[in-house]
């Protein structure tokens, strides 16, 4: 008789119910989610915060303050150099690596950058892959696609970029504009008309 059986037999003789064997600890088949890299996220949020402050001030001057423009360009250049090295080590900084706020900051940085077109196109590919696996919102792909196409001298696909003409903010030329709302819907974006109203409320208040 084993030790466990002897103990249970003793409990029965004493009028106590046999003790149940302890349950084995449950093991989860799902792999643990990797922790957010706090250092990378902190750096991205710092860059984003400074960029936002300078960019808002520059917009307020209607893009005429050259000193602010130079500061903004210097910050963006430094941020892109850092992002380039980060991508070499970690890949695109999506939600899993830097959280939602950090991933959004990385996306804004590459959108605003006047870096090499080749690097921006590389980032667009990484962003598409990240969106396909649910690591960034697909809307981010639409915005960066328009940036890259315009730098290539092409019309934008999604109508995310605007310019001022005759005192009004209007979209830059759009490829096959009749189908733009369908393309925007596929990227979880509102209609072009709704987006235009938001842009004008934000940057062209009455």
Regions found by a protein language model. Give the residues of each.
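Compositionally biased, low-complexity segments
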Residues: 6, 24-25
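An amphipathic alpha-helical core segment
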Residues: 124-190
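N-terminal helix-rich structural modules
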Residues: 25-153
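Short linear clamp-binding motif
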Residues: 2-11, 183
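Short, surface-exposed acidic
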Residues: 94-97, 191-197
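Charged/polar low-complexity intrinsically disordered segments
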Residues: 8, 19-20
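Intrinsically disordered, compositionally biased glycine-rich interaction modules
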Residues: 169, 196-206
């Amino acid at each position: 008789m084993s030790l466990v059986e002897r103990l249970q037999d003793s409990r029965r003789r004493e009028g106590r119910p046999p003790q149940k064997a302890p349950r084995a600890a449950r093991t989860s088949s799902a792999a643990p989610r990797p922790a957010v890299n706090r250092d990378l996220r902190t750096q991205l949020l710092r860059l984003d915060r400074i960029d936002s402050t300078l960019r808002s001030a520059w917009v307020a001057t209607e893009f005429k303050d050259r000193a602010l423009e130079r500061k903004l360009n210097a910050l963006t250049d430094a941020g892109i150099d850092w992002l380039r090295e980060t991508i070499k080590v970690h890949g695109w900084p999506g939600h899993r690596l830097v959280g939602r706020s950090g991933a959004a900051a990385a996306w804004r940085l590459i959108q605003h950058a006047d870096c090499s077109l080749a690097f921006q196109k590389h980032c667009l590919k990484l962003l598409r892959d990240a969106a396909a696996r649910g690591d960034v919102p697909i809307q981010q792909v639409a915005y960066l696609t328009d940036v890259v196409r315009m730098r290539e001298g092409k019309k934008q696909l999604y109508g995310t970029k605007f310019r001022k003409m005759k005192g009004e903010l209007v979209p830059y030329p759009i490829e096959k504009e009749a189908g733009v709302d369908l393309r925007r819907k596929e990227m979880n974006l509102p209609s072009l008309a709704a987006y235009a109203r938001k842009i004008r409320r934000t940057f062209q208040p009455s």
